[in-house]
Regions:
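P-loop NTPase motor module signature
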Residues: 1-500, 504-507
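C-terminal helical accessory/scaffold domains
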Residues: 510-521
């Protein structure tokens, strides 16, 4: 029987013949077991154990691994370019080692001086795991020379010289310190993500660099990094700064496209998982891309049900999504015993930055959740849409980090060619209330703030109008923060919900509001 996949690249034995798997009704496991509660309560302890696992890796092995990375082989040229230019763009293919090695090289050559190197990440799990890895490579305790800062968790000290943090955390620091004086080098990683926070950070850092150089203060160096991004737009934005390209160290990845369109991509993913599971060796792990927690829990429940009736290696299913507690997120990196296969069910959180060892097969559903809103009604919507071509390649690259692999795309080659090349920037499709409030708090004019892509005027006007209605600013034409507005900036949440929290004690419903906020986030 023909494979339901068309391959790109070299031919490979067909491993996707139909299985006698009955089609079952997909179900969601909502049970809160005693075991789940115990794991949640012991989350901090698990987190500490996993941090210890990072640090216990053989130091000599880590040193040898560093030396084999492409970025390490051209380290002299990179350091020379950083010394020569205040701003540079670095395009490094998957596996080049740019995210872990560039900050270390800067520190080893003392280019940060008496200040600190900041490395931004769009997601919290990436900031944490990268910091743990770099601390292990530098043979230091996390929170000492190397640290991280994410929402509600700051693991740094006065000694910290390399700091991994989410872009949102650096934005909050800019409110009290617009010139970002505590940093001498800022690395803006995963620039292709184009979240609202990353786009605003580009402008904040650009203005801080210009102001510091104009005042003859400690100069600020900026390094913009990505594996896939629109280089021309970024280069133009940063005044034609130099661009350096790094080769990757990826292994061959064979791409297979579905020959037909799948209406039910969850079912297609489950079928593909077990077709591969029964025909490939154990300890060759799978990474499956889904759109959110509900889908992940649904697929996880069905995998466990089917595994009971299917021959093959034992299975460990690991979820990975933004709302998962940090301790459970880090379980993804825990090695499985011999003879057991790990299946990681992840959102696009696993597309970039983080490397999950032993992933040999990627199952790409080809979809992602995208946030949009209507300026007329103010209603937000989270829709499942096709991911971009760049995202598809990023996903495929997860299979080739440590060994040759394959990516099974549950969509046709024609469908892939019709997709947009890059992600649509969030700033042109999302509400900007929080962003505008932050810019005003930083002393910047939202109307003239330099952005790579200019948001619709209706978006900025709607944000100013809402802030005025909330009482956060005094007027719309030349907005200044009110006393309430200053209080709202202290909360890392939407200004609407921040005001609800502030007003809740007056109405005696603080606990209920906190519970609602917790559910929402």
């Amino acid at each position: 029987m023909d494979s339901k996949y068309a391959s790109i690249g070299r031919e490979k034995p067909k491993i996707t013949n139909d299985l006698t798997v009955k089609r079952l009704k997909l179900c969601v496991n909502n049970a809160n077991t005693k075991k789940d509660k115990e794991q949640t309560n012991n989350g901090a302890a698990s987190n500490n154990k996993l941090e210890n696992n990072f640090s216990k890796e053989n130091t000599e092995d880590l040193k040898e691994a560093r030396k084999s990375l492409p970025v390490y082989l051209v380290r002299a040229r990179i350091i020379e370019e950083i010394k020569k230019h205040d701003t540079m763009i670095l395009i490094g293919e998957t596996g080049s080692g740019k995210t872990t090695q560039i900050p270390q090289l800067i520190h080893e050559h003392r280019l940060e001086g008496k200040s600190c190197v900041a490395v931004t990440q769009p997601r919290r799990v990436a900031a944490i795991t990268l910091a743990l890895r770099v601390a292990a490579e530098m043979n230091t305790d996390i929170g000492s020379i190397v640290g991280y800062s994410v929402r509600f968790e700051d693991v740094t000290s006065p000694r910290t010289k390399v700091k991994y943090l989410t872009d949102g955390m650096l934005l909050r620091e800019a409110v009290s310190d617009p010139l970002l004086k505590k940093y001498s080098v800022i690395v803006l990683d995963e620039a292709h993500e184009r979240t609202v926070n990353t786009d605003v950070l580009f402008g904040i850092v650009k203005l801080a660099q210009k102001e510091r150089n104009g005042q003859k203060q400690n100069p600020l160096k900026v390094i913009v990094m990505s594996a896939t991004m629109d280089v021309d737009s970024f280069r133009k934005y940063y005044d034609n700064c130099p661009v350096i390209y790094l080769e990757g160290r990826t292994y061959p990845v064979t791409i297979y496209h579905s020959k037909i369109k799948h209406e039910d991509y969850q079912y297609a993913a489950i079928c593909t998982i077990f077709q591969l599971h029964t025909t490939t060796p154990a300890n060759e792990d799978f990474l499956v891309f889904l759109t959110g927690q509900e889908e992940i829990e649904t697929v996880m429940t069905n995998i466990k049900q089917i595994a009971k009736e299917t021959v093959g290696p034992q299975i460990r299913v690991c979820p990975l999504y933004a709302g998962l507690p940090a301790a459970k997120q880090l379980l993804v990196w825990k090695k499985t015993p011999p003879g057991m296969r790990k299946i990681v069910l992840a959102t696009n959180i696993a597309e970039a930055s983080v490397t999950i060892p032993e992933i040999r097969y990627v199952i790409d559903t080809g979809v992602v959740k995208e946030r949009t809103w209507c300026t007329r009604t103010g209603a937000e919507r989270l829709s499942v849409v096709p991911c971009s071509q760049a995202a598809s390649w990023q996903r495929a690259g997860r299979a080739g980090r440590t060994a040759p692999g394959a990516s099974y795309r549950l969509y046709t080659a024609t469908d892939f060619k019709c997709r947009r090349q890059h992600n649509l920037p969030e700033i042109v499709r999302c509400p900007l209330t929080s962003t505008v409030l932050m810019l005003i708090a930083t002393g910047l004019d939202p109307a003239t703030f330099p952005l790579i892509d200019t948001p619709p005027k209706d978006s900025i006007h709607a944000a100013l109008l809402l802030l005025k209605e909330l009482g956060a600013v005094d007027n719309e034409s030349n907005p200044k923060l009110t006393v309430l507005g200053k209080k709202l900036t202290a909360f890392p949440i939407d200004p609407k919900y921040a005001k609800i929290l502030l007003c809740a004690p007056e109405y005696g419903c603080l606990e209920e509001v906190i519970l609602m906020e917790r559910i929402k986030h």
